[in-house]
Amino acid sequence: FVTGEYPVIKDVETAATGLLAALEESDADRIRELVLVDQRTNTVVTHRDVGIGISQVLPVLVMAYGSQEKLLAMEQPEIHLHPALQAELGDVFIEAALGSRQNTFILETHSEHLILRLMRRMRETYQRKEMGLPPVTPADVSVLYVEPDGTRSIVREMPLNELGELVKSWPGGFFEEGLREQFDDA
């Protein structure tokens, strides 16, 4: 990983050319291909051989586990992932934020599964259940809901209590979709 402070780049094209030359001169022999192992079949595969969700989440995992004491902003880190893996991603963020890495995350998500996992871990912390993860409290998680209002957007804080429950009613449309699919008659 690159560390240190660097000046603002004003001429992007010249800087990119210089970086490419430096990469070709010093790092070309160290570049490796990432391979994965399908645990069901014990088969080695590349990121190109797996679903798009797995290849999309790899940079998220690298940033979460490869960074320390950083502010990391991610847009829809759960995109194209199976719902169970979206929930597991919640545990990744808990570990990377509240464990030894101490990262801070700003996540833009549409995933009920990811949010529900954070809420569950908060409840398990309060109930003193062993999770194998750092404890999660309401002070550790801030849920913001952004909704359009004409030509502007309104940001609403949606606080959680120690049981991981929403203190305020959720604005319409988010958690309602799953309930509507389960219980509404057509």
Could you describe each region identified by the protein language model?
Residues 2-6, 15-22, 26-182:
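Switch/communication elements of ASCE P-loop NTPase nucleotide-binding domains
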